[in-house]
Swiss-Prot record:
Similarity comment: Belongs to the 11S seed storage protein (globulins) family.
Signal peptide: none
The protein, known as: Allergen Act d 12
Source species of the chain: Actinidia deliciosa (Kiwi)
Organism superkingdom: Eukaryota
Tissue distribution: Expressed in seeds but not in fruit pulp.
Keywords carried by this UniProt record: Allergen
Lineage, opening ranks: Eukaryota, Viridiplantae, Streptophyta, Embryophyta, Tracheophyta
Length: 13
């Protein structure tokens, strides 16, 4: 699942 990261980068999980 793809969740928007809180750092400004794209987190791919």
């Amino acid at each position: 699942n793809r969740q928007p990261s809180k750092y400004g980068l794209e987190e791919t999980i």
